[in-house]
Amino acid sequence: MNNNILEIIIPIYNEGPKVLKLMELFKKNIKINFKILFCYDDVTDNIFDYQDELKKFDFDIEFIKNPSQGPCSAIKEGFSVGVSDCVIVYPCDDLINVELINEMYNLFLNGKHIVAASRFMKGGSMKGCPLIKSILVRSASFTLYHLSSIPIKDASNGFRLFSRKL
């Protein structure tokens, strides 16, 4: 295992323009060594139209073909290909929370094996979220937290850090 680098799995589906914005934020905010694993469904994905622009960031980037389709399968493939002791799953459309990556990694270094970002903690928010979606997300998360053994208060948020020790 490579324990001195963070791998960031980003499931993508025709996210080209968003990826460039996200990479700008990564460059500005992430203060630790990291590698990006872009997990895509199909070779026609528009991410490949942006490869030259991505090279300008000088990041360690690997493109991983999803053997199936959808974000769940893409994340699983990212985990199977990755080698780091610490992996973050980051939603490509989250242009707000990049700075939390450093904090989450520090929690990992201090012994945490799972770190889940939450929109329901102090300082968290669901900016721009339609009311009905907000109600559904909050209700589902509340129910899962109280009726299951999962100690996560924001079950539908895809932004998480995992230790390979699990």
What are these model-derived regions, one by one?
Residues 5-7, 35:
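Cell-envelope/extracellular polymer assembly enzymes that use nucleotide-activated donors
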Residues 10-12, 40:
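Short beta-strand/turn micro-motifs composed of small residues
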Residues 15-18, 43, 71, 97:
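Donor nucleotide-sugar binding loop of glycosyltransferases
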Residues 15-28:
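Short, well-formed alpha-helical segments that are part of the catalytic scaffolds
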Residues 23, 33-43, 64-65:
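Short beta-strand/loop segment that forms part of the nucleotide-sugar
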Residues 40-49, 94:
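A conserved acidic beta->alpha catalytic loop
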Residues 57-61:
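A short helix-to-beta-strand connector/capping loop
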Residues 66-81, 86-89, 98-166:
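Acceptor/aglycone-binding surface of glycosyltransferases and processive sugar-polymer synthases
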